[in-house]
């Protein structure tokens, strides 16, 4: 990162450094910012799921772990209107995690940065999600498209139980370099506009400016 930011005898100095990385990459980008532009300081990974009582606990558990397995510092949060769903998701987490090769990382992540919040309505759940501004947001409710206008802050949004977050990482084509740590309130996913800049210009003829 430093070589790209400052240049060396064999590496041309870059104007901008983008892309994901671990805590060391993120720290290096932060230290070099100003000498070179960066996209954002991203990580650790996050997933937040807003679900109603009809959501499938097997899917929710799998999707929570899809991010928890990334890093012991990753966060995985469920917001739901159903206490019963929380109980069933917890059972699924216990059952599914034992079959996964990164189970120790998942358990550490969920123990320290996982959780469930019970709300009175999906509207309240979406409002809470907007305050958290998660990197990845799944909306597992009846008619999820109806909730889209209410979502203000999220890096990438996944609507419906057949649109799991890993689709965004590997298949759907949406960029998976995303804002974390609440920065989705003012950052967007990496995109073409991150590589475009503009300049202001002025031109006054003498007749307009006067003498």
For each feature predicted by the language model, list its residue ranges.
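C-terminal core of ALDH-fold dehydrogenases
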Residues: 122, 130-211
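Conserved NAD(P)+-binding/catalytic subdomain of aldehyde/semialdehyde dehydrogenases
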Residues: 1-66, 70-75
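Aromatic-enriched alpha-helical interface/lid elements that frame and gate functional surfaces
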Residues: 95-109
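Short loop-to-beta-strand entry elements in the cores of soluble alpha/beta enzymes
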Residues: 18-20, 40-51, 67-90, 106-117, ...
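General structural feature for long, well-ordered alpha-helical segments within catalytic domains
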Residues: 13, 20, 24, 28, ...
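Short acidic-hydrophobic, aromatic-tinged amphipathic segments that line or gate anion-handling sites
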Residues: 1, 116-121
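A short, aliphatic-rich alpha-helical micro-motif
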Residues: 11, 110-111, 151-152
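Short, solvent-exposed amphipathic alpha-helical segments in soluble enzyme
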Residues: 9, 32-35, 63-68, 92-96, ...
